Amino acid sequence: MSEKQKAVAAQERVTISKRDPWALKKWFSVYAPSYLGGVFLAEVPASEPQKLLLRTLEVSLFDITKDLSHLPIKLRFQIHKVDGLKAITRFKGLELTRDYIRSLVRKGTSKVSAIVEVKTKDGWVMRIAVLAITTHRIGSAQKSAMRKRMFDVLTRKASEMDIGQFLKEVLEGLLTADLFVAGKKIAPLRKVEIAKIKVLKYPPEEEQTTVKELTTETVAAS
């Protein structure tokens, strides 16, 4: 392409973008990380793939599993790799809806909250908030003892698992079952929930962000 042709093409792009900014955008398919099944999450627009990097998406676990009991669970993912029109995410966090948490607390019960920092065996550092609801009111000594139990369970389980195994236990309710068993040795429990997870530090391989541009060869191969 000659310099004159390049200039004309550039001017056409400017004209189009002024008339309709969406004309230069492409739609990218966003997927969950492989350790969460690599399922399709959403389609998002961007004028160039670099602008997708580190963008955060929030979806309900219900959108992935179609299990109604998962409606209160919000998952956060962050795009860190783009390959053509495919964007790959990494897990960023989890949180229960406020309405659901409020529904757990009833008159005559106690709420025991614990915040624990854990590290998986493959190097993910996360802060986890746990919520336990007792069947009746308990004292501060019992609350402290229960927090200690929950701390021990969470740190031990995380250290024994990689991120995929750990999140599988969280999302399938296996981790809360272990916390329930540990906590009820201190006082009778009605419910235990993982209220929030926030990733504090990724392992080196997850820190990297990459973009593989869509090329003519890529389109032809697809």
Curated annotation (Swiss-Prot):
Does the keyword section mention Repeat? no
Q: Name one Pfam family in it.
A: Ribosomal_S3Ae
Q: Which InterPro entries match?
A: Ribosomal_eS1 (IPR001593), Ribosomal_eS1_arc (IPR030838)
Looking up SMART domains in the UniProt record yields: Ribosomal_S3Ae (SM01397)
GO molecular function, a single term: structural constituent of ribosome
Q: Mention one GO biological process in which this protein takes part, according to its record.
A: translation
- UniProt keyword annotations, A-Z: Ribonucleoprotein, Ribosomal protein
Which HAMAP family does this UniProt record tie to the protein?
Ribosomal_eS1 (MF_00359)
Instruction: Please give the family membership noted in the entry.
Output: Belongs to the eukaryotic ribosomal protein eS1 family.
Protein name as annotated: Small ribosomal subunit protein eS1
Which organism encodes this protein? Pyrobaculum islandicum (strain DSM 4184 / JCM 9189 / GEO3)
Q: What is the lineage of its organism?
A: Archaea, Thermoproteota, Thermoprotei, Thermoproteales, Thermoproteaceae
